[in-house]
Regions:
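Conserved donor NDP-sugar-binding/catalytic core segment of glycosyltransferases
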Residues: 98-131
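A short, conserved alpha-helix in the catalytic core of glycosyltransferases
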Residues: 160-163, 167, 171, 179-210
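Short, flexible, basic/aromatic active-site loop/helix in glycosyltransferases
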Residues: 135-154
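Short aromatic/hydrophobic "clamp" motif used to bind/position activated sugar donors
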Residues: 86
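Short, well-formed alpha-helical segments that are part of the catalytic scaffolds
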Residues: 13-26
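Non-catalytic, C-terminal membrane-associated alpha-helical segments of glycosyltransferases
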Residues: 228-235, 245-307
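Glycine-rich, basic loop-to-helix element that forms the pyrophosphate-binding segment
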Residues: 65-81
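A conserved acidic beta->alpha catalytic loop
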Residues: 40-49, 93
């Protein structure tokens, strides 16, 4: 039995899996070895053969979960984990060679903590426009800038995190949050789990020296993608509030009307600007307001139709 496991779920990851799998092949093995679990979440591209061809070079178990949803896929993989530490990541992440050894060392050095996060930095697959570096929120790319040490649960992010198996216990990822095939999904898939674990008494630690690279594709370097991300994150904040009691309070109607009026005024003022960054910054609040509104409406409908 392996000493620790690495688990990720992938849907149509053919564009980013090759560099990720190359990096996984170069990993230093921790004492006791390791197991890699990849869950193909209904891919329609060449993800399945890409994974199969690496099984001879990696301690890789490939599972299939056709029901769409990242958390659905992760839950399907949890039954296959081995060892006392589980590292979670995504299909577009390049870890450093000492990744497994570093997480093992960290877990051994911090016995009072059960949830661990590493730093995340972007690896641009195309040069980012200047306005993105100036104006785009780093969180939209899962780009972290935290100090090492104890940290609050919301700062543990899915591309680079580990959880003690004993803390995980019978907990599973909530399948009603996170990527699910819809453009307007609610973000926060791993955060929801970490918040539950923290509520059960498990503490979080961040290690700034365990750095994984997040592959950023050209399609993510557009205002359209970033605004969709703003919308999704706003939905996620409200969804987390419903699931964990940790979301934003509802605005009084008059205040909400005022926020909309201000957002529309800024958008109109900047619509003819020659600076795409200025246009994005003007459009972002409106995208977030719409995400917040749509999620609250969806929850209200759910309550009305509940038995």
């Amino acid at each position: 039995m392996a000493a620790l496991s690495v688990l990720f779920s992938t849907f149509n990851g053919a564009a980013t899996l090759p560099p990720m799998l190359d990096a996984l092949e170069a990993l230093q093995s921790p004492p006791g070895g390791w197991k890699l679990i990849a869950v193909d979440n209904g891919s329609t591209d060449t993800t399945a053969p890409l994974l199969r061809e690496r099984q001879s070079r990696l301690p890789l178990t490939v599972l299939s979960e056709p029901r769409r949803g990242k958390n659905v896929g992760l839950n399907a993989g949890l039954d296959a984990i081995e060892g006392d530490l589980v590292i979670f990541t995504d299909d577009d992440v390049v870890p450093p060679p000492d990744w497994l050894v570093a997480f093992r060392r960290l877990a051994d050095a911090q016995p009072d903590f059960d949830i661990f996060g590493g730093a995340i930095r972007p690896r641009w697959l195309a040069p980012p426009p200047d306005w993105i570096l100036r104006c785009a929120p780093k969180g939209h790319f899962a780009w972290t800038e935290f100090e090492s040490g104890p940290i609050e649960p919301r700062a543990i992010w899915g591309p680079n995190m580990a959880v003690r198996r004993a803390a995980l216990g019978e907990h599973r990822f909530h399948e009603g949050i996170g990527p699910n095939g819809a453009a307007g999904y609610a973000t926060g898939s791993e955060i929801e789990l970490v918040l539950r674990l923290a509520a059960a008494g498990h503490r979080c630690w961040h290690a700034e020296d365990i750095v994984a690279l997040h592959l950023i594709e050209p399609r993510q370097l557009t205002a359209k993608w970033l605004l969709q991300r703003s919308y999704n994150q706003a939905r996620g904040e409200v969804r987390l509030g419903a699931l964990c009691g940790d979301g934003p309070p509802a605005d009084p109607p008059l205040r909400r009307i005022g926020r909309y009026a201000s957002a529309f005024a800024d958008l109109a003022r900047c619509s003819l600007s020659g600076d795409p960054g200025e246009r994005f910054l003007a459009a972002r609040p409106l995208a977030a307001l719409r995400g917040d509104r749509d999620e609250r409406r969806a929850q209200a409908r759910s309550l009305r139709t509940a038995p």
